[in-house]
Amino acid sequence: MDSKGRNVIVCDNGTGFVKCGYAGSNFPTHIFPSMVGRPMIRAVNKIGDIEVKDLHVDDLMVGDEASQLRSLLEVSYPMENGVVRNWDDMCHVWDYTFGPKKMDIDPTNTKILLTEPPMNPTKNREKMIEVMFEKYGFDSAYIAIQAVLTLYAQGLISGVVIDSGDGVTHICPVYEEFALPHLTRRLDIAGRDITRYLIKLLLLRGYAFNHSADFETVRIMKEKLCYIGYDIEMEQRLALETTVLVESYTLPDGRVIKVGGERFEAPEALFQPHLINVEGPGIAELAFNTIQAADIDIRPELYKHIVLSGGSTMYPGLPSRLEREIKQLYLERVLKNDTEKLAKFKIRIEDPPRRKDMVFIGGAVLAEVTKDRDGFWMSKQEYQEQGLKVLQKLQKISH
């Protein structure tokens, strides 16, 4: 709470999950899928052994509840690539977040810190503020850039954040607390695309996943089994010539499937976007290009503080593969293959264990530090007087 007794909450609305809680806390109070489910015509009368009539299915279900009953629901995701695509559904998610089932707060007596990816469309930000003040009537609000929050959580003020969540990956250099928007790179490949690609690879093996609920099933399987190959050619030989990589996985309906080379082939799309028909460089080359585009004086500082953040950086093998590829690019393009000079090149990739929640943790730190600084927050009164011009306050603070 701030000095006037108002609640201060942080809400990190990701494409895949909502992470929300109070300022100053070490982890989110609630984490739940950012999904809305509507019942299909229920031709199926049983799920497993449970009679459907025993289950209470509302007209509309959100978050955990929608996830648990997903085989009965048509599931939709209000956000795509970090941008809200369906505002009505997004409001259902927020109703659920602020309502009795989760945060259970009175918005009129609450300050809220929201997050957004760098390079997000202004329209998205404007609509978000409008909804917060007009629909919910929050006392004050602030919108922070996710990459900067990640660095706060890591206790740094300069570095490069590679943030890969469910909907978008971005590489954002930050120098002395300022995000450098002209150097920020965005890659529209993230967790959801890798899940889609895994579904496609499994289809080629003869396993069909075509119901909207299966998407969630494959996502959970991906998190258990996928990894990033250090040496792709070697991994491919292992997959073709041996059964070392094969793992059995039991689906919720009891079927057992065998997964082999798909375990590293699916997340490989992060490094080779052409695998899923996306043009452009992969995550390692993008990080290298970003740092090389920065001022020569700050490059060493950036190479030494590459911080991973977001659920899609949790694959085993990702940090070592990133380091290897960036070193290789530096050797070829900067040192012109002079291997003796490579010893002087310092690179460090930080992979904090709690990186799934890094953005929230940084937000909780920022909200706690600024909770009594009225000049920091956009108040409802300012919004009523100035309308969307109030957003200019953000620019003054963050740049």
UniProtKB/Swiss-Prot annotation:
Places the protein is found: Cytoplasm, Cytoskeleton
CDD domains attached to this UniProt entry? ASKHA_NBD_Arp2 (cd10220)
One of its GO biological process terms is: Arp2/3 complex-mediated actin nucleation
Keyword Chloroplast on entry: no
Sorted alphabetically, which keywords does the UniProt record give?
Answer: Actin-binding, ATP-binding, Cytoplasm, Cytoskeleton, Nucleotide-binding
Q: Which GO terms describe its cellular component?
A: actin filament; Arp2/3 protein complex; cell cortex
First-listed, main subcellular location of the protein, grouped into a coarse class? cytoplasm
**A molecular function (GO) term:** actin binding
Chain positions recorded as ATP binding sites: G165, D166, G167, R219, I220, M221, K222, E223, G310, G311, S312, T313, M314, Y315
Has keyword Metal-binding? no
Q: SUPFAM superfamilies annotated for this entry?
A: Actin-like ATPase domain (SSF53067)
What InterPro entries has UniProt attached to this entry? Actin, Actin/actin-like_CS, ATPase_NBD
Source domain of life is Eukaryota
Describe the family membership recorded for this protein in Swiss-Prot or TrEMBL.
Belongs to the actin family. ARP2 subfamily.
Oligomeric form and interacting partners: Component of the Arp2/3 complex.
Summary of the function given for this chain in its UniProt record: Functions as ATP-binding component of the Arp2/3 complex which is involved in regulation of actin polymerization and together with an activating nucleation-promoting factor (NPF) mediates the formation of branched actin networks. Seems to contact the pointed end of the daughter actin filament.
- This chain's protein is named Actin-related protein 2
Give the organism, scientific name.
Answer: Drosophila melanogaster
